[in-house]
Amino acid sequence: MEAKQADLNDREALRNAFTAVDAVINRAGYYPTVPRPWRDEVQTAKAQMQNFYDACTHLPLHKIVYLGAAIALPRDPTGRPGNEEPRYRKQPDKKSPYLQVKWALDEQALTMAQQGLPVTIGIPTMTFGEFDPGNTTGRFIIELANRSLPGYVNGRRNVIYAGDAGRGLVRVCEAGRPGERYLLAGENLTMEALIGKVAVTVGAPMPKAIPLNVARLVSAWQTFRFKLGGPEPKVTDSAIAVMSLGQFIDGEKARKELGFHPEVSVDDAIARALKWFQGNGLVKSELKS
């Protein structure tokens, strides 16, 4: 495997990056971080990915792996763990930019596969580990360690170690079938249980659960303040979506078809991520030894 970088807005750079390779794993999926209208976010995300797919069409690639998101899968109406098969019949009603972007990119990937590109979708669940800049899921560890996490919204999640997710994506590239999704799943946990594990690891008090409607009001106020020139919101729409719109996940398909089994526990994943954050100056509070 070889890591290459290219700007998704630069088609020539993408084509040059893909020279002399026979497969590509795209780990640059768009992630809304700063408040913008959801339609603008979707337009940007799809345009960038279309540049990627257009570059791929000119090359003899045997596999293209899009790194998807579990939120793009509709929840099981019976409450059972979700799997790869369900697909929204229409655009999701909730206008969360994160949900809308990930749904649109999932649909785009499936469409490209139907049009003949060898696109396979690998979907790691909520990921913790090293080499995280801390602006997505790693924020839960960083902010709780720094005593700056305002609270959490309860919900259902599946959590996997980043290294295991990486191995899984390689297996998707090696053995996944074009046009198929593969969930790379770890442990099913409520957000309350997950935040509790993080709190124990960093030696911080357990933060309070925030009702979903309260979190949305806080996010709306902070977004309004940001648009008037204030600081970036701490309670973002994307963070609320990550916490509240998830579901437990069934990873049986990847186990059967790819032989994928996670090896690192959630506790170890949190500890490894924390050590990396400490070593890179992202955690500043004094921690429990």
Predicted regions and their residues:
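NAD(P)H-binding glycine-rich loop region in Rossmannoid oxidoreductase-like domains
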Residues: 1-47, 55
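Conserved catalytic-site region of short-chain dehydrogenase/reductase
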Residues: 33, 70-81, 127-134
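Conserved Rossmann-fold NAD(P)-dependent oxidoreductase catalytic core, especially the SDR/UDP-sugar
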Residues: 44-97
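Conserved beta-loop-beta element that borders a ligand/cofactor-binding pocket
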Residues: 68, 107-130
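A conserved pocket-lining segment of Rossmann-fold NAD(P)-dependent short-chain dehydrogenase/reductase
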Residues: 90-92, 140-160, 164
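Mid/C-terminal beta-alpha module of Rossmann-like enzyme folds, strongest
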Residues: 168-234, 251, 256, 265-288
